[in-house]
């Protein structure tokens, strides 16, 4: 069965409820959608970070939790960019 919107939203809620999210939690979301290329993953992580940034502060237990989640999104973006650059350098 394919990963659907209700599962995605459930994972988002669980992630926001989690005190200390790790990069593996962020990568799980992209992996669940089986995103095919690093470029698409970069855009997905950027949109995910943008979405978390738009959440009201009251959704998070405190500012530190919010900043941690945003930082994990940024780490995922950075790793996906590195993967994309490696993929491009292999083509040369």
UniProtKB/Swiss-Prot annotation:
Please report any disulfide bonds recorded for this protein chain, giving both cysteine positions: none
Q: Which SUPFAM superfamilies match?
A: Type III secretion system domain (SSF140591)
Source organism's superkingdom? Answer: Bacteria
RNA-binding listed as a keyword = no
Keywords attached to this Swiss-Prot or TrEMBL record, sorted alphabetically, are: Plasmid
Q: Does the keyword Membrane apply?
A: no
**The protein's role, per its UniProt record:** Involved in the control of Yop release.
Q: What binding partners and quaternary form does the record give? A: Interacts with the translocator YopD and with residues 242-293 of YopN.
Family, as annotated: Belongs to the TyeA family.
Please give the NCBIfam families that the UniProt record associates with this protein: type_III_tyeA (TIGR02511)
Give the protein's recorded name: Protein TyeA
Source organism (scientific name): Yersinia pestis
Please name the taxonomic classification of the source: Bacteria, Pseudomonadati, Pseudomonadota, Gammaproteobacteria, Enterobacterales
């Amino acid at each position: 069965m394919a990963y659907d919107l209700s599962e995605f939203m459930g994972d988002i809620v669980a992630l926001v409820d989690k005190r200390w999210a790790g990069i593996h939690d962020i990568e799980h979301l992209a992996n669940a959608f089986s995103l095919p290329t690093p470029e698409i993953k970069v855009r997905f992580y950027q949109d995910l970070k943008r979405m978390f940034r738009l959440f009201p502060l009251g959704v998070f237990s405190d500012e530190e939790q919010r900043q941690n989640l945003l930082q994990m999104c940024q780490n995922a973006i950075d790793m996906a960019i590195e993967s994309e650059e490696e993929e491009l350098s292999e083509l040369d």
